[in-house]
Amino acid sequence: MVIMIGKWIPLERVLRFPEVTPEQVTAALQQCVDQVRNNLPAFEAKFPAANSEHNFYTPGPNTDWTPGFWTGEVWLAYENAKNDSDRFLFRKAGDCQVDSFLKRINIKHYVDHHDMGFLYIPSCVAAYKLTGSVSAREAALKAANQLITRYRPIGE
């Protein structure tokens, strides 16, 4: 019998690693929040490209399959921010990005594919759960409705 931690992690795999202290976890999480904050000037209203050029992700529009990941990081930083100033910055960026996702689904720009979850769950679903944003909810529901159009009962 395999003992699991949560749904996905076998206990035996966890036992192979040294114990991590709560302080180390807290410091690592703060480092992540700091890195997202440091990247906001380049990516507040833009999104990292799907792949790097010379180890640098250039800012660009919400047109590919990966922008939801960055916005998800912004919402995780918002959720874990230690002060109101950071929370304000992350909320402002997250709301701006949600507007971009709503616009994208409204004009149906590159949304007829299976990556809709990558786009809209970490961005708009997260925003709605954290803030109650009406725009985020609208975008997420429209994305879900778009995704369901891909269903084929027999498959093709």
Could you tell me what each predicted segment is?
Residues 1-156:
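Glycan-recognition and catalytic cores of secretory/periplasmic carbohydrate-active enzymes
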